[in-house]
């Protein structure tokens, strides 16, 4: 038996001791030539399904501890990005709960400015987990133990959706040893807004006995609006646009302005109960609920249709409020069998979204493109998309993980997931029919325009307004997986992994263009509706190989060959009639990423941890969202091939007893490597060999500096400065695709100082010191007033108070 390097490799159930170390985020490592207080803190993770020091795991993993999250004021995903080099997202503000737009290692094919109201059909390229539950939320990052960021394809252990990587959010668990509580409150002010921001958080832990405890966290956050809407259409009592100058036939929009339109609220509560049922078995039941509400989106007005304009103004016709609600219930069971630890993870998830989006510009573009035929040249088209979606999922995973300090380590498991979603989209008319009714008898005595419309269109519920869509998706995934590691010597090990999966995807859809009537219906019905249902089945397998070698006590070389994938499926495109789409686009295949990575990680003198990795990922059958046919029905198609190559460096250094610096930088070269003809409404666009992958900056970097200053009265000061940089990026493959621009690079900086005395602390902070907008995506359709860019929060100055109670 030669495996003696780390006793942490055993997964024998030691939750009380281990979870305490993990919650603290540290295990101190020794150094012969340095003071005990100078050693770098070493984090314990469970990303490989066993507890290990992050420096002993032979892949590139970044960890953001709960302490760092609190000290830097990280609140959500958009904040977290600034601490993790190589992780990219489009800042959608409070609407980020609808779609997972995370990008890692350059693997992305969707436009970062894609409509954020309607959930994408295509699966994300980065999978996300709450503990062991595969769920995406725009999570309020409170009472978090750590965030684990696994770079590169993780298909064997984490399954579908992990082509670029995996992000795991690990919550603090109940503590059976002592009662504790904390309460914090903050107030801040953001540039360009008149009102204040507020936040409140509470965490309480209560032992119920020596073997059971309950933990509750809850909070509320309110962000004031900062964007002014300068072109809002005025509606009358019937909900129709008031014609300019009182001219019902030829008048355009009567408009007004509204200040600070993009305020938002977040409410959350999480309760968990831990029970040591026996000496060898523990159960953790968790219930999580979160609500996000947004008054409107945070846009900038692009006056040039590209990247320049008024940063805190919005030119859209309507405000775009949204509500997002999520419930997650999970049960985790662990039992130590001696030779191995058995784990069961059961999760029930339900999320719902209601949202509105201003799409007046789309209808104006259609009318313009058809020479005024589509909507008779109406001078004040005004349409709002109203969307309601419900998404439910059941996930079950059983795992068996070997224990003991043996030459062989192994993980084996089975996985099941059933996800159902139903989305109803309705484009509501706010002027067209009223305008039609005002136009006199011009069609050979048939009456008003509205009378003419009524002869070939029957707009009865639910087929009212201009567009209607009811989409239902059902996805079932079954898999077996495993990894096997052999330790040839204390310094050399090799791992092989596999995953075999069986998947079934069903899609059905009803789409209608009521104003188009029988002309747009394959069967000639008067409501212009068409329906379609399709299904597809897939089965395949993935593999992984990893080898690592300790060059010396402090440095490890590793090599990884791994695969990741996103599941295939079926589109519910109609194949006949006005909206017909070529039948070859009904089924879309899984895409697959193959990663080759070489890296070195280790420690300098006990004070600095480092990781350096070089990788190349070949991506085949790329999936991307499209709008197909004359109706622009959302779906997924396969592209061809792409390649992403890059270098990543991360340093974590305890320079002195009181000074720590974390630094990371990544370079990514991600591009199409084979021409692909991609469906684009009724036409095709070509993603050409050499085109960049959308939304991927070449360079990203982050730095976090912490300095502690003890004071004579027993109190202390903690100073923090952190910053992030991302270089320019193109928002689509080329100019043949919509919303294509090159957004400039930008950097953002934040600073804070915290005074602490015993259990009480005060934190003063400035976020986004330079008031950088940070443009990350655009929508630049035909109508100039509708050109928008997605930006982040402006400069925010505030103070936060915190009090902790510990028994």
Describe each region flagged by the PLM.
Residues 193-295, 327, 391-392, 396, ...:
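Transmembrane beta-barrel wall of Gram-negative outer-membrane proteins
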Residues 38-176, 598:
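Acidic, small-polar-rich N-terminal luminal/periplasmic segments of exported/outer-membrane proteins
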């Amino acid at each position: 038996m030669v495996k003696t390097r780390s006793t942490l490799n055993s997964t024998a159930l030691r939750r009380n001791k281990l979870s305490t170390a993990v919650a603290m985020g540290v295990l101190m490592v020794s150094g012969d030539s340095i003071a005990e207080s100078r050693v770098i803190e070493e984090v314990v993770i469970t990303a490989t399904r066993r507890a290990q020091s992050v420096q002993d795991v032979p892949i590139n993993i970044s960890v953001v501890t709960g302490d760092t999250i609190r000290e830097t004021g990280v609140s959500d995903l958009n904040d977290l990005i600034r601490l993790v080099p190589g992780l990219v997202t489009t800042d959608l503000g409070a609407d980020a709960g609808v779609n997972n737009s995370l990008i890692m290692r350059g693997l992305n094919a969707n436009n970062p400015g894609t409509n954020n109201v309607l959930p994408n059909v295509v699966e994300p390229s980065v999978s996300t987990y709450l503990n062991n539950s595969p769920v995406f939320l725009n999570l309020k990052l409170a009472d978090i133990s750590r965030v684990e960021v696994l770079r590169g394809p993780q298909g064997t252990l984490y399954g579908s959706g992990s082509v670029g990587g995996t992000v795991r959010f690990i919550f603090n668990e109940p503590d059976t040893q002592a009662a504790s509580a904390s309460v914090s409150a903050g107030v801040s002010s953001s540039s360009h807004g008149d009102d204040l921001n507020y936040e409140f958080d509470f965490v309480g832990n209560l032992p119920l006995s020596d073997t059971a405890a309950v933990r509750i966290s809850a909070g509320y956050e309110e962000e004031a609006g900062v964007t002014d809407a300068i072109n809002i259409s005025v509606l009358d009592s019937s909900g129709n646009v008031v014609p300019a100058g009182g001219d019902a036939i030829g008048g355009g929009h009567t408009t007004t302005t509204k200040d600070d339109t993009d305020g938002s609220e977040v409410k959350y509560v999480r309760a968990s109960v831990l029970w040591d049922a026996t000496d060898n078995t523990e159960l953790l039941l968790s219930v999580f609920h979160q609500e996000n509400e947004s008054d409107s989106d945070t846009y900038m007005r692009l006056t040039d249709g590209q990247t320049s304009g008024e940063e805190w103004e919005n030119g859209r016709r309507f405000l775009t409020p949204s509500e997002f609600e999520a419930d997650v219930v999970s049960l985790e069971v662990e039992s130590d069998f001696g030779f191995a630890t058995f784990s069961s993870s059961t999760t029930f998830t339900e999320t719902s979204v209601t949202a509105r989006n201003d799409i007046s510009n789309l209808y104006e573009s259609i009318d313009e493109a058809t020479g005024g035929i589509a909507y008779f040249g109406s001078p004040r088209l005004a349409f709002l998309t109203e969307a309601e979606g419900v998404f439910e999922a059941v996930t079950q995973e059983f795992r068996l993980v070997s224990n003991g300090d043996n030459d062989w380590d192994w993980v084996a498991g089975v996985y099941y997931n059933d996800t159902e979603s139903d989305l109803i989209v309705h484009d509501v008319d706010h002027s067209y029919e009223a305008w039609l009714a005002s136009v006199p008898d011009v069609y050979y005595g048939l009456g008003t325009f509205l009378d003419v419309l009524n002869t070939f269109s029957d707009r009865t519920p639910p087929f009212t307004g201009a567009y209607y869509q009811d989409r239902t998706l059902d996805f079932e995934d079954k898999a077996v997986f495993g990894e096997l590691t052999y330790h040839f010597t204390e310094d050399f090990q090799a791992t092989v992994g596999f995953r075999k999966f069986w998947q079934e995807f069903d899609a059905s859809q009803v789409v209608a263009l009521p104003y188009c009537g029988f002309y747009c219906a394959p069967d000639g019905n008067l409501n212009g509706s068409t329906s379609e249902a399709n299904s597809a089945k897939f089965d395949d397998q993935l593999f992984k190989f990893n080898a690592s070698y300790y060059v010396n006590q402090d440095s490890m070389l590793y090599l990884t060959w791994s695969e990741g994938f996103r599941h295939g499926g079926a589109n519910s495109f109609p194949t006949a009639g006005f909206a017909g789409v070529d039948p070859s686009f009904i089924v879309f295949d899984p895409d697959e990423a193959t990663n080759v990575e070489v890296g070195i990680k280790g420690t300098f003198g006990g004070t600095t941890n480092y990781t350096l990795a070089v990788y190349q990922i070949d991506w085949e059958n790329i999936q991307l969202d499209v709008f197909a046919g004359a109706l622009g029905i959302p779906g997924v198609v396969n592209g061809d091939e792409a390649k992403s190559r890059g270098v990543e460096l991360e340093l974590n250094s305890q320079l002195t007893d009181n000074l720590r610096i974390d630094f990371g930088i990544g370079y990514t070269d991600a591009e199409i490597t084979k021409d692909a003809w991609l469906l684009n409404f009724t036409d095709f666009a070509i993603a050409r060999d050499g085109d960049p992958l959308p939304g991927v900056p070449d360079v990203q970097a982050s730095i976090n500096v912490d300095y502690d200053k003890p004071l004579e009265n027993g109190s202390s000061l903690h100073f923090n400065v952190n910053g992030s940089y991302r270089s320019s990026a193109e928002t689509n493959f080329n100019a043949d695709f919509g919303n294509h621009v090159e957004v400039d690079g930008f950097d953002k900086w934040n600073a804070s100082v915290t005074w602490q005395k015993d259990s009480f602390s005060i934190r003063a902070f400035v976020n986004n010191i330079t008031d950088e907008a940070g443009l990350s995506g655009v929508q630049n359709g035909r109508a100039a007033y509708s050109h928008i860019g997605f930006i982040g929060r402006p400069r925010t100055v505030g103070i936060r108070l915190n009090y902790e109670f510990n028994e």
